[in-house]
Amino acid sequence: MPDYAIGDIQGCYDPLQRLLELIDFNEKDDCLWFVGDLVNRGPDSLAVLRFIYSLPVKPKITLGNHDLHLLGLLFGGQPWKGHDDTLEEVMLADDGEELGHWLRKQSLLCRSSELNIVMCHAGIAPLWDLSKAVGLANELEAVLSGDSYHEFFAQMYGNKPDIWSDDLVGLDRLRVITNYFTRMRYCDAHGRLDLGYKGTLSKAPNHLYPWFEVPCRKEIEMDIVFGHWAALMGRSSHPRIHAIDTGCLWGGQLTALRLQDRQRFSVPGYGVSRFE
């Protein structure tokens, strides 16, 4: 009964099915961990959601920024971001709202002491130890799954505040927790988020670090599995930090990491021209 962590799918249903065939997935016994960004930009977000929703063994899911964007559209009155969104089919589906309510009750962080694994979409903020990260994930999850979710989704967008403080309260506190868990790539030496630069590591400004290389980063006792950052192509500088977004939608691959032995499996994704 192996566990597999699956990288960012982003509505790429066919590559997901090919990947599950490659790993000889047994839906009655195996457990899938989804690192988030199940939806958007790819052609089959509705099929992806329906498939994962129907799995007989409950999967572990950490929400990504595109998943939260869908929830903002469904429940927060958020406007369409632009022509790159491919969520209309979900929005118009008879079961779209049902799938949304299921999605908003998923996690920001999943962990297993037995497997020595913690998973979240973008990573763990350099300023947080594992206990702090778990507590803050639980705090945000309670809002997403509770009665005040409409208010949160209506106001979740924004780049400020951009650094964690225990003194933060209200929506500012929830927003920075959200941004660390779902949007983070680069931080400065003090752990401050930089959500503006999205280029390559080689061209990054000197004052910015990948979140897992920030000098003040607190050590996490477990191996970390994260997605969100296709440009890394599955590589990080740390042997216990596993990047599994390998750019399925952008001419790369869709990757699964078997958590028992950290072995990787990949299938080709879509070429960029697929959506031009």
From Swiss-Prot:
Top-level EC class as recorded in UniProt: hydrolase
Pfam families documented for this protein: Metallophos
GO molecular-function terms, A-Z: bis(5'-nucleosyl)-tetraphosphatase (symmetrical) activity
InterPro entries per UniProt: ApaH, Calcineurin-like_PHP_ApaH, Metallo-depent_PP-like
Keywords associated with the record: Hydrolase
Catalytic activity of the protein: P(1),P(4)-bis(5'-adenosyl) tetraphosphate + H2O = 2 ADP + 2 H(+)
EC number: 3.6.1.41
UniProt entry tagged with the keyword Hydrolase: yes
Family note: Belongs to the Ap4A hydrolase family.
Role of this protein: Hydrolyzes diadenosine 5',5'''-P1,P4-tetraphosphate to yield ADP.
PANTHER family: CYTOCHROME C5 (PTHR40942:SF4), PTHR40942
Protein name per the record: Bis(5'-nucleosyl)-tetraphosphatase, symmetrical
Record lineage: Bacteria, Pseudomonadati, Pseudomonadota, Gammaproteobacteria, Legionellales
